């Protein structure tokens, strides 16, 4: 049957039902109980993310298709993150494109208008031609769908590691806007509502939820990958927003198809669906396939009978299929019928309550023996600053229509955060962060660290974080070392979000990111955070003679850093001191609001050296003294490449003001250098390093590699 359930789960089903399910019922159970849809190995831990916040309209406790927060003036922001990792490994164009389509439908299922997308892409070594092919097609798929549907891609991440050679990670986040009294649920609260399906059902995506809930085998069928149709997606978007007032609930058809959507929308009630009423793309489809097909560009609506005609007429204007396929019932049973015969008859509470698993854990933390770092500075500078993680991502952004709808305020790559304008005149900053190298060293500190980094990134444009979603991407949870890091990352994320009082209103868990030899990816939890610009927006500007001020304390912490990864330097992972992240961020926000700085960048990937390099790519030079860096080490390499948390560099004409402001907040800051007109020259302790080749590499690397791949 191709069922992905464990023997213990199959025995549990037989016990609960008191009978043997038929083949179609097994396929339904396999979809609804899949890890992808049920969170059976993670849900118990995800509950710890819940924060009671007056701004939360729809949060993690509601378990809906997207989260929503109040932003004032009667408006709400809707936010969601998803991935399409396994499909993108098989068919990168359609895998990535359907990832965009799915996240858009999650946003409109709340009645919200999508206003921004972010893409977070991780692929393997670009010296391998397959990875070049994957990246080309992933970016092309995202661009094709986002550009066609009219939602701008405003930012994201693009990074590279051998761990992703067989398992690219393709994450997409979306932001939507809606009047808060117009938000739609994804579940019903009464029987008698008609189930209306928009869109054609085909044979693509069969078993997709189950496919996403196991490791890649090397023998996976292309049929498990859905096919994207952005023009149909645009119709779904426009009509859904048009008819939102006429429907009671909206549910995207994603993983598990109708099997999952119908089960989840009932909210514990029941439903009866007549399969022969479902519009088909392929004639004479197997009724069982119809139930679990994951054909894209479909939506399910729960509608009062009196409004059904008006809802379907809206789709008919676009010649888009719309049909009443069933109804919500009081009897808590999910029934799929074909020409009067029940093919599926399963209790709702059985489907909605899969077994929960707590797998064994194994502490994989290692006691690292610190060694004196003895590297030639020039070699460290050249090797770290030419790493693909740090080069310009302009090659990717140039393929996106990031200014469509004219809401984009800060262009992709121009700052540490994307910024979009909202209907109430406010500005919303958005950022995504992950740190798999740090997570491989310490899941707990990594969990705290990615939240803190996202918070700092928002601060660099003058925004304060207010809401987040997470995506937790790991290997097989049944492996004790994988599950341990997963649990530790959740502990760190939860601690940090509670500290910053930032509610996580939704997210996703993606397990089984392994190759066919069973090698898992590095643990890759991801945070997407959004927040309102508090007063003034900072658009980075570099000028001659500005002072370089380092805000925050540098520590001898190279573990998980880019330097330690490249040169294999054993070191402890940084300890994330959340109070320092908060206070240094407040210094930066205050400095922006007072008009005291022209440029701000957090210190993270690549350390202080990478942050200084971001000034050089503006066409200037920088001179610094490492003796002026406030730190616990005299080692120049450690000062320049440590990735300690809680730090920024800012450019200012009033450096003493920044130092005093920092002191008033309980944070250290020091004047470490000055900007000059010596283009491409980084002067460190009176020694000039000509970085022209590195600057050229920064702008040209991806275009050259992707053009030659």
Swiss-Prot record:
Substrate binds at residues 83-86, 105, 226, 294-296, 510. Monomer. Part of the FGAM synthase complex composed of 1 PurL, 1 PurQ and 2 PurS subunits. Keywords: ATP-binding, Cytoplasm, Ligase, Magnesium, Metal-binding, Nucleotide-binding, Purine biosynthesis. GO terms for biological process: 'de novo' IMP biosynthetic process; purine nucleotide biosynthetic process. The keyword Metal-binding applies. ATP binds at residues 39, 80, 470, 507. Its EC number is 6.3.5.3. InterPro entries: PRibForGlyAmidine_synth_PurL, PurL_linker, PurM-like_C_dom, PurM-like_C_sf, PurM-like_N, PurM-like_N_sf. Part of the phosphoribosylformylglycinamidine synthase complex involved in the purines biosynthetic pathway. Catalyzes the ATP-dependent conversion of formylglycinamide ribonucleotide (FGAR) and glutamine to yield formylglycinamidine ribonucleotide (FGAM) and glutamate. The FGAM synthase complex is composed of three subunits. PurQ produces an ammonia molecule by converting glutamine to glutamate. PurL transfers the ammonia molecule to FGAR to form FGAM in an ATP-dependent manner. This is Phosphoribosylformylglycinamidine synthase subunit PurL. GO terms for molecular function: ATP binding; magnesium ion binding; phosphoribosylformylglycinamidine synthase activity. The gene is purL. Disulfide bonds: none annotated.
């Amino acid at each position: 049957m191709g069922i992905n359930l464990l023997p213990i789960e199959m025995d549990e089903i037989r016990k609960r039902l008191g009978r043997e399910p038929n083949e179609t019922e097994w396929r339904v159970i396999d979809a609804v109980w899949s890890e992808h849809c049920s969170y059976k190995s993670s849900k118990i831990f995800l509950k710890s993310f819940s924060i009671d916040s007056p701004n939360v309209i729809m949060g993690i406790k509601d378990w809906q298709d997207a989260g929503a927060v109040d932003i004032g003036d009667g408006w709400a922001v809707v936010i969601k993150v998803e991935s399409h990792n396994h499909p993108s490994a098989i068919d990168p164009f359609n895998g990535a494109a359907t990832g965009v389509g799915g996240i858009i439908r999650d946003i409109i299922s709340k009645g919200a208008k999508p206003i921004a997308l972010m893409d977070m892409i991780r692929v393997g070594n670009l010296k391998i031609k397959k990875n070049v092919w994957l990246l080309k097609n992933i970016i092309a798929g995202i661009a094709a769908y986002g550009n066609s549907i009219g939602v701008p891609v405003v930012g994201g991440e693009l990074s590279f590691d051998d761990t992703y050679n067989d398992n690219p990670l393709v994450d997409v986040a979306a932001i939507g806007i809606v009047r808060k009294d117009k938000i739609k649920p994804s579940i019903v609260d009464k029987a008698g509502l008609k189930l209306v399906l928009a869109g054609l059902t085909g044979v693509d995506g069969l078993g997709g939820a189950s496919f996403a809930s196991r490791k890649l085998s090397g023998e996976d069928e292309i049929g498990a990958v859905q096919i994207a149709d952005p023009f149909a997606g645009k119709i779904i978007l426009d009509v859904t927003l048009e008819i939102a007032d006429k429907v009671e609930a909206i549910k995207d058809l994603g993983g598990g198809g109708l099997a999952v959507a119908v089960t989840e929308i009932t909210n514990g009630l029941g439903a009866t669906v007549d399969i022969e009423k479902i519009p088909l793309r392929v004639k004479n489809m197997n009724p069982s396939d119809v139930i679990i097909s994951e054909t894209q560009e479909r939506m399910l609506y729960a509608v009062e009978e009196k409004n059904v005609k008006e809802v379907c007429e809206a789709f008919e204007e676009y010649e888009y299929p719309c049909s009443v396929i069933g109804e919500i019932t009081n009897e808590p049973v999910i029934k799929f019928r074909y020409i009067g015969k029940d093919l599926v008859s399963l209790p709702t509470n059985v489907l909605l309550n899969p077994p929960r698993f707590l797998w064994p854990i194994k502490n994989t933390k290692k006691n690292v023996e610190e060694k004196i770092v003895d590297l030639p500075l020039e070699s460290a500078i050249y090797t770290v600053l030419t790493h693909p993680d740090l080069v310009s991502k302009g090659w990717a952004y140039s393929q996106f229509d990031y200014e469509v709808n004219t809401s984009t305020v800060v262009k992709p790559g121009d700052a540490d955060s994307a910024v979009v304008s909202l209907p109430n005149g406010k500005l919303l900053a958005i950022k995504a962060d992950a740190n798999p190298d740090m997570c491989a060293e310490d899941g707990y500190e990594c969990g705290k660290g990615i939240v803190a980094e996202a918070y700092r990134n928002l601060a660099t444009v003058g925004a304060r974080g207010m809401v987040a979603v997470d995506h937790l991407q790991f290997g097989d949870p049944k492996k004790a070392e994988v599950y341990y890091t997963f649990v530790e990352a959740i502990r760190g994320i939860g601690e940090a979000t509670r500290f910053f009082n930032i509610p996580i209103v939704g997210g996703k868990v993606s397990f089984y990111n392994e190759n066919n030899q069973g090698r898992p990816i590095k643990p890759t939890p991801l945070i997407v955070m959004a927040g309102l610009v508090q007063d003034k927006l900072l658009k980075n500007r570099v000028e001659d003679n500005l002072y370089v001020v380092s805000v925050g304390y540098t520590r001898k912490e190279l573990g998980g850093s880019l330097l330690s990864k490249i040169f294999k330097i054993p070191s402890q992972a940084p300890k994330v001191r959340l109070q320092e992240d908060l206070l240094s961020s407040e210094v930066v926000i205050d400095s922006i609001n007072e008009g005291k700085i022209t440029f701000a960048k957090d210190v993270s990937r690549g350390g202080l050296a990478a942050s200084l390099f971001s000034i050089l790519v503006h066409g200037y030079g920088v001179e610094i003294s490492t003796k002026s860096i406030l730190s616990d080490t005299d080692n120049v390499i450690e000062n320049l490449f440590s990735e300690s948390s809680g730090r920024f560099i800012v450019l200012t004409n009033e450096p003493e003001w920044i130092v005093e402001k920092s002191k008033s907040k309980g944070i250290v800051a020091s004047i470490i250098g000055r900007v000059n007109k010596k283009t491409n020259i980084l002067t460190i302790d009176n020694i000039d390093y000509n970085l022209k080749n590195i600057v050229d590499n920064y702008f040209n690397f991806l275009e050259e590699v992707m053009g030659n791949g």
